[in-house]
């Protein structure tokens, strides 16, 4: 079952906003799947595993569609049986609530709970 965070809107950071503090992002991180971690207090990283390249590619394409629809784009790394994801808000140079919303939506797609 996916996190309720996946149902929240993806909203850009307000002009002049500061990245989330570690206390602030810890609450959001707890709502994500176990593949996610915060790296250097700066960005989210996850590696999703698949049985083959075709499944990894299909997942990558679904994430691409999500990113285009929301206007918030992760860095994606596709390889055989894996998709690596890095997510952060470039405008503020760190993490924003919307990064965690996107991560929760990626978990939802991976779990098959509403990727369309």
Swiss-Prot record:
| Gene Ontology terms describing biological process | tetrahydrobiopterin biosynthetic process
Q: Which reaction does it catalyse?
A: (4aS,6R)-4a-hydroxy-L-erythro-5,6,7,8-tetrahydrobiopterin = (6R)-L-erythro-6,7-dihydrobiopterin + H2O
Q: Where is this region: Disordered?
A: 1-21
EC nos: 4.2.1.96
Record keywords: Lyase included?
A: yes
Cite the entry's keywords alphabetically.
Lyase
| Matching Pfam families | Pterin_4a (PF01329)
What would be an example GO MF term here? Answer: 4-alpha-hydroxytetrahydrobiopterin dehydratase activity
Write down the top EC class of this protein: lyase
This one is known as Putative pterin-4-alpha-carbinolamine dehydratase
Q: Which organism is it from?
A: Halorubrum lacusprofundi (strain ATCC 49239 / DSM 5036 / JCM 8891 / ACAM 34)
């Amino acid at each position: 079952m996916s996190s309720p965070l996946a149902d929240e809107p993806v909203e850009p950071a307000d002009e002049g906003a500061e990245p989330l503090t570690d206390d602030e992002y810890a609450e959001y991180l707890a709502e994500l799947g176990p593949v996610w971690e915060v790296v250097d207090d700066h960005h989210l990283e996850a590696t999703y595993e698949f049985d083959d390249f075709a499944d990894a590619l299909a997942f990558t394409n679904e994430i691409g569609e999500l990113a285009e629809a929301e206007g918030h784009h992760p860095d994606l790394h596709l390889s055989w049986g894996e998709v690596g994801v890095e997510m952060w808000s470039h405008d503020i140079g760190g993490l924003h609530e919307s990064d965690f919303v996107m991560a929760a939506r990626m978990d939802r797609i991976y779990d098959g709970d509403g990727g369309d």
